[in-house]
């Protein structure tokens, strides 16, 4: 995984949107880190592409669906402010180290290997 200071620019829109999203998450979640992945991380996104963010949370694993739906509501508020839609993907401490525990283990591996750690 690389960090956002190792790339020419994790464009201003992505940084601003991710920061706004993280600020809104603080009231409800203990965020360990956020990782940008997908087309915006690869740099092959279009103007209407969403911003895929893996949100790694501290603590005991919660319910994925409930957490994702709650985060999607927060993401909608951020989209109204920034014009960029965030697609949150909640993970918990240790999940990236054990992709084999997931039905979509290839996605977890991609996030761990190719994602851009923000902040």
Model-derived regions, located:
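Catalytic core of pol beta-like nucleotidyltransferases
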Residues: 1-32, 42-47, 58-119
